[in-house]
Amino acid sequence: MPTTCSSPEKCLRYAETVQRFGINFLRVAVFIVFAWIGGLKAFQYEADGIVPFVANSPMMSFFYNKQAPEYKQHMNKEGAVVPANIAWHRENNTYGFSYGLGTLIVSIGTLVLLGIFFPKVGIIGDCLLIIMTAGTLSFLVTTPETWVPNLGGPNHGFPYLSGAGRLVIKDIAMMAGGFILLGTDLKRILKARLSSSKEGESCCCNNN
């Protein structure tokens, strides 16, 4: 796109259109990610995979019946079915918690998406998105598995993120998106109120 424009007003309208599209696309993207990941929480392999995060979190570990690090003896590889491990996870409330978390995640994504049409609903979703991603980022502090372990190699601990850590750190971008959406929805509501106020004042002046 050229850096100069013969019609600044036209270019400004174009930029505003691109911005609106980007904001709405951000909402759709958040919905897709949250609906997909939230839906996967209903499946055994995904429920097993989040156990290290939940078990080590001071804010979430109470949802489980077992204490960390007992889970390390009962982790299933993705795609594997080990009946003894699955039985342990049932006793731990691994699957019950995962179902509830999945429902919450899908709900947040839906609220964010509805913000396209209803900014007040969007604000609720935006705030929950920020809170959810903040909780996810806290796993970098509470979950040992987010860092490369010391197995004799030269690279371990901070700043060497493991596969789990690399997955978690991406939520910082999702959090930034939440703040952008929150600011956008607040601005929309305030603009609507100001517009209504001006219309009311105009009507009063005309009547006088």
Residue ranges and their predicted role:
Residues 2-208:
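Membrane-interface extramembranous regions
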